[in-house]
Amino acid sequence: MIEHLGINTPYFGILVSLIPFVIATYFYKKTNGFFLLAPLFVSMVAGIAFLKLTGISYENYKIGGDIINFFLEPATICFAIPLYRKREVLKKYWLQIFGGIAVGTIIALLLIYLVAITFQFGNQIIASMLPQAATTAIALPVSDGIGGVKELTSLAVILNAVVISALGAKIVKLFKISNPIARGLALGTSGHTLGVAAAKELGETEESMGSIAVVIVGVIVVAVVPILAPILL
């Protein structure tokens, strides 16, 4: 019976990904952004559960999943649009923006490493966790290049984003950060795409700064992690 589901076609993996994503998006909006209903998180859990319950292999899913994965990198390029829209702000505060994001990203990388060695994780797990500061399209090839497990990296990136999506705006308000540039950079640096979504709810400037942060963090991760990995591992 399972064979009749078309599991050997790309449509299977695409539908297994998109159906829970669309449903979760509907309820996520209905519940005013309840973090456990974050579409990325729900579709990931639902996909794993479906494959586990049906006994369908990951290889069957991957046929269609790879097609979705192909569009991750072109989608990331879209973050250049807010960069262009806010180019005057970027020119005016470029040192503060680049400096703040660079410091935040390096601290995040070191904290990830300290947590990993505290819990005595193996080198492969540490390599999988180090790139999680970047968005998925950037983190996965970096993880693969330093000997990490891409699936584990993807999980780390998504969980990190879900937490920031749920708590990021509240933390910004808790610390009374009123500057829209600072708020956007904080959310984008810590939560990548979902951080930008949280920043969007605060304002247009926050959204643009969050998008800028995603791009810059990605560049830093690509440049720094491959250099740090041989030293730390």
Curated annotation (Swiss-Prot):
Cellular component, GO annotation: plasma membrane
Keyword Ribosomal protein: no
Chief place of localization: membrane
Membrane protein topology class: Multi-pass membrane protein
Transmembrane segments: 5-25, 33-53, 63-83, 97-117, 152-172, 212-232
GO biological process entries: cytolysis; killing of cells of another organism; programmed cell death
Subcellular location: Cell membrane
Keywords: Cell membrane, Cytolysis, Membrane, Transmembrane, Transmembrane helix
Family annotation (PANTHER family): PLASTIDAL GLYCOLATE_GLYCERATE TRANSLOCATOR 1, CHLOROPLASTIC, PUTATIVE SEROTONIN TRANSPORTER
Function: Inhibits the expression or activity of extracellular murein hydrolases by interacting, possibly with LrgA, with the holin-like proteins CidA and/or CidB. The LrgAB and CidAB proteins may affect the proton motive force of the membrane. May be involved in programmed cell death (PCD), possibly triggering PCD in response to antibiotics and environmental stresses.
Protein family according to the UniProt entry: Belongs to the CidB/LrgB family. LrgB subfamily.
Protein name, entry field: Antiholin-like protein LrgB
Native species: Staphylococcus epidermidis (strain ATCC 35984 / DSM 28319 / BCRC 17069 / CCUG 31568 / BM 3577 / RP62A)
Lineage start: Bacteria, Bacillati, Bacillota, Bacilli, Bacillales
